[in-house]
């Protein structure tokens, strides 16, 4: 399906057959594409672009396309000579992390009455225990997982660091996009977060899930579709996996605010500002006196601070789950299959030109050729597509479809807004809750909460906003990936229990 933009181009909508795109999302997409007019305006006024061939090259939307904030979720754009900071959202390096384990379903289910309280304690009741000093936090923000690897001795195995194995973490860099490290030369605006260089302290960010559709979930492999790939990746029917979905939280939102200040400061004076509020940041050219290089470097530094935090946050959430399960059951094997962002800007050379792939709520789905010199060279990039809370999730392998800008969905995509979902079908919601195991900061079964209808009402609304009926059918979404040769299914998973903040 092609959507004409009114500016001489079109956007490819890779949607399920018969799936009518959300009207509000389509209107938002049309408004977003007014940025083509902004590009032409910048060319006419002169001096804005540092590269002579700067252009907007292509846009597609993935099957989980739905309304966002200015730019729809599921949007992928390719530009040359400039970036669009808003096109990766503010939760920079929101992404997915997936572990295989040697755990068995029977031992998990038989221990839920003791395991779920321990998970709640570690995630929400003061058991997180991730002490870090300023040296570590700065290394994390500048170099991501590599920075933590180089400074892990500072914490002396305290708290969750007791589950941090340096050799394992070094090996897992090969199973993480960008090796878990996108370099930054500065930590603008983050001095208070970093803290004292040599004093161990705690913060309320690292090891946090965040709100919305973020989660940590223990899953059972229900069905295998590609036996060869599944075997190579350690995926077995009935096996237990741990999937993590979160990002850079407050760090990312602060970086997003700084990036908006940077982009607006570089907008030419006397030129009408874009009606859609979407600004461009030009890549610097040969003339370094025009301030473009400084703005460009600031942008990438603050973006990469957040991205590096996102990688570290998902890693620590994995260690926290490992700690909870080990404390109740037994020491167990956890192997990282892959960690991949779905809110970021990728640099890619195409036809000899440096281009930028912007993904907002869309993940990379490179094929075998693009994954050469990685552990996935013979299969394609792992793609994790979770369904709504309580429904199936899928593991796929990327097929490197250039028409889809080497991209795939990052989820099922909303069908109802959060407000609409809160007023969903009561009977359907109750049936869902009867068999669904969820861990949240609030335990609704606590005796002291039975008389607090206000707290329980708010808790129920937060769960309803993410209930299955609020999202599109994940099976149809995955089928579109097959049809358009974006990614091929490897396995389907079902939740055992879910952790939501």
Predicted regions located by residue number:
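Domain-length cofactor-binding catalytic modules of enzymes
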Residues: 2-47, 54-60, 67-77, 82-87, ...
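An acidic- and aromatic-residue-enriched active-site/binding cleft used to recognize and process polar
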Residues: 64-65, 93, 101, 246-247
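N-terminal cap/recognition module
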Residues: 82-89, 94-102
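Patatin-like phospholipase
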Residues: 105
């Amino acid at each position: 399906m092609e959507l004409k933009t009114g500016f001489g181009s079109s956007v490819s909508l890779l949607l399920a057959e018969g799936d009518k795109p959300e009207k509000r999302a389509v209107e938002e997409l049309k408004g977003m594409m007014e940025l083509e007019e902004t590009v032409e305006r910048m060319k006419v006024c002169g001096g804005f672009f540092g590269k002579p061939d700067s252009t907007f090259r292509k846009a597609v939307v993935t099957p989980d396309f739905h309304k966002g904030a200015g730019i729809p979720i599921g949007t992928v754009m390719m530009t040359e000579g400039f970036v669009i900071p808003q096109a990766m959202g503010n939760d920079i390096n929101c992404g997915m992390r997936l572990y295989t384990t040697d755990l068995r379903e029977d031992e998990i289910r038989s221990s839920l009455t003791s395991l779920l309280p321990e998970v709640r304690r570690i995630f929400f009741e003061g058991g997180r225990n991730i002490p870090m000093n300023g040296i570590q936090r700065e290394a994390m923000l500048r170099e991501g997982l590599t920075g933590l690897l180089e400074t892990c001795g500072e914490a002396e195995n305290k708290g969750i660091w007791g589950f941090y194995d340096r050799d394992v973490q070094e090996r897992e860099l090969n199973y993480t996009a960008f090796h878990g490290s996108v370099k930054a030369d500065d930590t603008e605006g983050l001095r208070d977060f970093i803290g004292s260089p040599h004093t161990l302290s705690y913060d309320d960010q690292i090891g946090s899930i965040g709100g919305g559709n973020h989660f940590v979930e223990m899953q059972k492999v229900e069905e295998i579709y590609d036996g060869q790939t599944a075997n190579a990746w350690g995926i077995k029917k009935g096996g237990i996996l741990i999937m993590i979905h979160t990002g850079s939280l407050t760090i990312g939102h602060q970086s997003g605010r700084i990036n908006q200040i940077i982009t607006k400061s570089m907008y030419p004076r006397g030129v009408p500002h874009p009606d859609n509020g979407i600004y461009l940041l030009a890549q610097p050219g040969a003339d370094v006196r025009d301030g473009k290089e400084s703005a460009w470097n600031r942008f990438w530094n603050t973006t990469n601070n957040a991205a590096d935090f996102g990688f570290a946050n998902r890693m620590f959430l994995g260690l926290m789950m490992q700690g909870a399960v080990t404390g109740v059951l037994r020491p167990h094997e956890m192997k990282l299959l892959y960690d991949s962002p779905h809110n970021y800007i990728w640099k890619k050379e195409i036809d000899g030109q440096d281009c930028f792939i912007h993904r907002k709520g869309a993940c990379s789905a490179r094929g075998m050729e693009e994954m050469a010199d990685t552990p996935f060279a013979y299969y394609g990039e792992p793609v994790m597509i979770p369904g709504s809370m309580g429904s199936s999730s899928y593991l796929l392998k990327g097929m490197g479809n250039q028409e889809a800008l080497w991209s795939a969905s990052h989820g099922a995509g909303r069908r109802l807004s959060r407000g609409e979902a809160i007023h969903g079908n009561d009977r359907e919601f109750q049936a869902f809750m009867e068999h669904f195991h969820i861990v949240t900061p609030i335990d609704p079964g606590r005796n002291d909460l039975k008389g607090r209808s206000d707290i329980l009402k708010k808790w129920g609304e937060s769960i309803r906003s993410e209930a299955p009926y609020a999202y599109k059918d994940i099976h149809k979404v995955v089928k579109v990936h097959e049809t358009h040769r974006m990614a091929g299914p490897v396995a389907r998973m079902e939740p055992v229990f879910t952790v939501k903040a």
